[in-house]
Structures are given as structure tokens and as C-alpha cells.
Swiss-Prot record:
Effect upon mutating E71K: In GIDID1; reduced interaction with PI4KA
Subcellular location, record wording: Cytoplasm; Cell membrane
Subunit structure: Component of a phosphatidylinositol 4-kinase (PI4K) complex, composed of PI4KA, EFR3 (EFR3A or EFR3B), TTC7 (TTC7A or TTC7B) and HYCC (HYCC1 or HYCC2). Interacts with PI4KA. Interaction with PI4KA is direct. Interacts with EFR3 (EFR3A or EFR3B), interaction is direct. Interacts with HYCC (HYCC1 or HYCC2), interaction is direct. Association with the PI4K complex is strongly reduced by TMEM150A.
PANTHER family the UniProt entry points to: TETRATRICOPEPTIDE REPEAT PROTEIN 7A, TETRATRICOPEPTIDE REPEAT PROTEIN, TPR
Gene: TTC7A
Record-given protein name: Tetratricopeptide repeat protein 7A
Gene3D superfamilies per record: Tetratricopeptide repeat domain (1.25.40.10)
Organism: Homo sapiens (Human)
Amino acid sequence: MAAKGAHGSYLKVESELERCRAEGHWDRMPELVRQLQTLSMPGGGGNRRGSPSAAFTFPDTDDFGKLLLAEALLEQCLKENHAKIKDSMPLLEKNEPKMSEAKNYLSSILNHGRLSPQYMCEAMLILGKLHYVEGSYRDAISMYARAGIDDMSMENKPLYQMRLLSEAFVIKGLSLERLPNSIASRFRLTEREEEVITCFERASWIAQVFLQELEKTTNNSTSRHLKGCHPLDYELTYFLEAALQSAYVKNLKKGNIVKGMRELREVLRTVETKATQNFKVMAAKHLAGVLLHSLSEECYWSPLSHPLPEFMGKEESSFATQALRKPHLYEGDNLYCPKDNIEEALLLLLISESMATRDVVLSRVPEQEEDRTVSLQNAAAIYDLLSITLGRRGQYVMLSECLERAMKFAFGEFHLWYQVALSMVACGKSAYAVSLLRECVKLRPSDPTVPLMAAKVCIGSLRWLEEAEHFAMMVISLGEEAGEFLPKGYLALGLTYSLQATDATLKSKQDELHRKALQTLERAQQLAPSDPQVILYVSLQLALVRQISSAMEQLQEALKVRKDDAHALHLLALLFSAQKHHQHALDVVNMAITEHPENFNLMFTKVKLEQVLKGPEEALVTCRQVLRLWQTLYSFSQLGGLEKDGSFGEGLTMKKQSGMHLTLPDAHDADSGSRRASSIAASRLEEAMSELTMPSSVLKQGPMQLWTTLEQIWLQAAELFMEQQHLKEAGFCIQEAAGLFPTSHSVLYMRGRLAEVKGNLEEAKQLYKEALTVNPDGVRIMHSLGLMLSRLGHKSLAQKVLRDAVERQSTCHEAWQGLGEVLQAQGQNEAAVDCFLTALELEASSPVLPFSIIPREL
């Protein structure tokens, strides 16, 4: 009975030894070795003659104990020197007593030769690892050749032997890489490279099988214990981690994209274990990087298809996979398969993001500082790739939602704050973006790009001019520390002053701000004399204060640097029109539209120039082109999934939807049946306009600029129809615009003009008043209202309204002309003459459209 009990104890210790070697519990090895030796001593009852698993004599047990202790000592030494191993720094035996002791044990075992072939082979594998870490790469390769690792089988072997073999293959590959190349021939080098990749691929597969089997065994043993007792997470050793990733890293480094991607996809398809979760995040991030940076959409192949033949021919498989036991893969019906590289990269990154953000170390205690830094770097790298991926598809809302999830661990992390801020800018959440940028300024106060970005947003979409001025002053206050961004700081401040001048209601304030704007912009030009953007805005500022000749000189300099700039060409056309060279202006606009066919501002200027030069008929034809451009750029399928005909030829028809609908009569001559040129233009415009019938539910979809542009097209067409006295057609156009924005001041103003042309003066006056209520600074509205009040006999009130208009915009010659007419009607001839002279002087330098239509933005 005693012998039977001792035999059971021996089996239990032996099983525990195998488990500890597989799971890496090296601190338990000395105690287990002592128990084993005690049981194996004569009289201990553990000598099991005839047992295939442990038929040791006492000297054999002593050598077996040395093997176990040598492995434990070496693994503990490697754990203590993980950083050096990672940096490929050889460990010196004299500085590492554990490694020295392990080497002595292993040398003794191999010299005695008393152990069974299995354990002698294990000793060689462990000694090969030791040779590698001490920098003896040839000795490591020789030891693995002596052990015969290429012919080893994994069938019916203990788990720890899988780990040893996986590490052996990766170490052999790393050792081959580090051998000197001076003597070897090119053929031998190529052969060696192939052998390295073969070693890495074998190591990867064996490591994955080992980790899957280890988790299965651990879970089974845990299930036999109490519920709620969870197995400890297995910590990957350096060499196991290298085994998992060396194959795809080596292939990608050599330019073998097909094999590298195949390795990565295989790794990601294997059934994961707890130990490989972090590794899979890294692999997914790596594959996403390859898909984004190294593979075009034309060369992409899905995980379930084969790569292009030209790729297949170059990269043959380097080893026979049939001989290896494959890890378990995720399989099943109806698995999702990406259609292109962006889709696959996005899928990988979204999965990686969910795992990485879950594992981020939030604790700020000093002991976890390094872990926190590493986890944050991994998460930030994933978000950077997500920014690239979603940015390519314009999915900025989705990107901002992803980045917002990072805010829970972004405390003090400038890069993440800045990424979130930029994503908010891109998806149109400008106010939120400015709030985030304020925090970024606090985190990095010496970085001029952050306040510049904030100023750009404030100037552009928000028009928060006081905040823009504050941010611009931040950049300027940095002085020389701002470097190349200092001129941009002055540019931002100059544009802010210019916009403030446009918004100012008092002429004295306008003049002061225009002066400050010009001085600041000229300072920016002194700092960056060849910057075309700075020169452009100096020219624009000169144009705004009607220094037309000086503005033209500056603009010529800007065009020398950037000949095809849309804003510069647009300003040139407006300057020509201010000099009354309308044909030159039209030629410039046509040239600019050739370069920038989707620029609506240029198209509207062309309509105005044609209206002045050729009359409303030609302008209506261009209006039709603008409407078609709108339809092309903002198709119904993008907005609401409506049907849309792809053809834009004559006779275009499409299925009409309920909602807005425009029908323009053909304006036939009833007697002769002939059609005037204006009627032809009108019918063509009707043809284009009738295509744009849409449900009102669509109107709130898409950016606001989309619909304000369409409103402007309708109102421009209405103005041209009114000039031709086609009042019914004009009414339909205004009705369409009103369907978009019923209370828009532009719509109310145009309805007032239509009522005025029809002779409904009281209605016109009321509509002008409503428009002025919506837009109290509308000079054009004030002008029309003033003249209407004068016609109705309210001379004093008309004079007040027109004086407000010229005070609000002192360069509006129409307002001066109207004020002169009212003063003349009141008998104030001298004051009227002054107004007429001012109007005449201003009209001589007035463009067809205000210079302020040129966007002032960074």
C-alpha cells in the first residue's frame, strides 16, 4: 500500500512538473525537483521500474532535476533581462549567475548522457536558447541541428515541448539572421533567407497550436475546481511573442506582400486565446497599415479569393504546411468578407479599437506608468490609422464618434485631444472643436498650429471674430518661437479685422478696422513676401477699400506664384469688372471655370457678367448650367435614395416625386407660333429646373450650404426673368426658393421686388420690412425699402433708411444714388448733388458683385 501511495505521489509530482513547465511557473520548480528527488531515492518508493514515463535511477533523477532547474534558472534570467533580450543585447555569463549555473547544469547533463533521448533533446533545445542569449549564434544553430528539430513531431507530446520547439524555430531563424554575410555567396544568402522564413513560419504555427491547447487544458483543469476560480492569464515570453509575429514581419520587410498578408490573415482567423488577445490587436493594426499604405484598391484581393497572378508567380510558399498541425480557425457559413482594402482595414481597426480601449491602463500610479504609456501608444496608433481609413471615405462623423470614446483615457494626452478636435472640425461640429482646441492650447502652449487651427474655425464656419482675434494674438505673442507660422498669425488677425469691418455698422468703425486689417496683412506680407495666400488677401483688402490699381498690382504678384488659384482668378475678374472691362472679366471667369468647374461662386459671377454684357437671355442659359452642376454634385441618391437619371441630355426626364414642382410656360407668340430667344432660354431652364422636384423630407438632409446654394440659383433665375418681364416664371422660381427657406431674407426681398414690378407697392413695402427684420444689416434691402417709401410719399422715413444704408456700407453706390434722389425730392439740392457725385465716383470702381464674396479664410 505504501509503495502504491508513493507511486501515485510520483505521478502527481511529474504531472505538476509538466504543467508548470507549460504554464511558466518557474518559481515552483526547485520545490517540485526536491519532491521528485525525495520520491526517487532508494526507499522512497518512487522508483517505478518498467514505467515508460519516468524509469529513473537516482543518478538519472539527479540529471533530470538539473534539467528542470537549468530551464527554470534560464527563464528567470530572461524575465529579469527582458529589455536587453528585446534589444538583442547579449547577456554576459559573468554578470548573470543564474545563466552561468544553468549552463553548468546543461553541460553536465550532455556530458553524462544518462537521460533518455527525449530529455537529452530537451537539454539541447534549452542550451540552444542559452547560446542565443549570450550571442553565440553559430553554437545555437549547431545545437538545434544536433537536436534534429526539423524532424521533430508534435503528436502525443507534452505541451511544454510545443513551447520549446516553437521557441527553437524562432531562435534558429533569428540566429541565421545575425550570422555575418561577408563570406557567403549570393546563392547561399538567398538560401539562408528562405530558411529563416521557413523557421519563422513553423514557429508561428506551433506557437498558436501550443497556446490553444494550453488554454483548453487550463480551462478543463479549472472547471474541476470551485466555480468562480478563474485561471491566471498566461504571459507570453519574448520568444513566444517573436514566434507569433516574426513570419509576417520578415515577409513584409522583404517586400513579400502576398505572403505577409496571408500570414496576418491566418493569424487573425485562428481561434484566439487570452494570451494572444493583445498580439491580435497588434497584428490587426499591422495588417490595416499594410492595406492602407502598401496595397492599392486595384491590387486588392479579399481573404476568400486569390491575389493577382503576377503576385502569385513571384512569391511561392517556402515550406510544406501539410507536415504541421494547423491551429483551429474561425469557420462557419455566411462569414462577412470585405470588398476592398479600406473596408477590410476599417473592420480590423474597429475590432482593434474595441479591444485596445478596453485594455488601456487608466491608473496613474507610478508603478503602472510604463504600462499606461505603452497602452496609450497602442490605442493612439489605432486611432491614427482609423483617421486615415475613415478620412479616405469622408466618414468624419463616424471618426469623431470613435475618437470621442478615447476621451476617457486622454487626460493630458495632447495627440488624442488634437485628433478629436480635428475630427470635429471635419464633421462640422465647429463649436465643440473650438472648445477642444482651447484644451489643446493648455496642453501645448508653445505650439502655434493649435491656436491657428482654432482661429481658422472661428473665422470660417463660426464667424466668432472676437475669439478668432484672441487666438491670432496667441500666435503673434509667441514671436520668433512661432517660426514659419508667425506670418499666418498676422494673416489670421488681418482677416479678422477685415471681417469685423464688414460687420461694423458705423462708417468710422469700418474705416478704422479696414486700416488695421491692411496694416496687419502688410505685416504678414513683410514676413512672408512670397506667400500667395497673404498677397491675395492684401489685394482683396485693397479692393475692399476701392484702391483698385494697387489691388491689381498685388494680385498680379500672387498669380505669378499660383496661376490657377480660384480665389485669385475670381478677384481678378471682379477687379476687371470694377474697371468696367467686362469682357476681360468674363474671359477670366471662363478660364477659371475651366480649371474649377465645380465652383458656384465663379458661376454666379459669370451669370452677372453675361447679364451686363449680353443680356438676361445668355445669363439664363448659364443659370441652367449652374442648376445642372448642382444636380450633378448633389445627386438625389446621396441625399435620400431617390431615383436619378444619369443622362443630362436634352429631353431629360425623371420620375416626379410629390412636393415642390416647377413648370415654366414656354412664352409662345400666340399669332405666329414663333419663339423668341428669351423663350428658348426660359424653356431650357424649365427643363433643368423641373428635374429638381423632391420631397420636403429631403430638405433637411445634407449640409446647409447645399440648400443655400440652390436657393441662390432659384433667386438668380427669378431676377433674370423679372428683367425680361416674365413675371410668372419669376414667381415660380421664388416659390421654389421659398420652399427651401420660407423666412429667408433673400426670399422675402425677392418677393418684394416681384410685388414692386407688379405695382403692388404696399405689399412690396411690407415684404421689404420683413426682410429687413430678418437681416437688419441688408444694404440692398434698405435701398429698395427707402425708394419704396419715397414712392409712397414717406420722404423723411425714406431718407433715414437710406442714410442708414450708406452708413452701413459706404461703398454702395446704389444707396448713395437713392439717397440723392430722396434729398432732391425734398428740395435739398446741394446735399443731393454731393450724394450723386459720391455715387458716380463709387460706381466707377464698383464690381458686378461685391468683393466680399471672395471667402476670407485661412
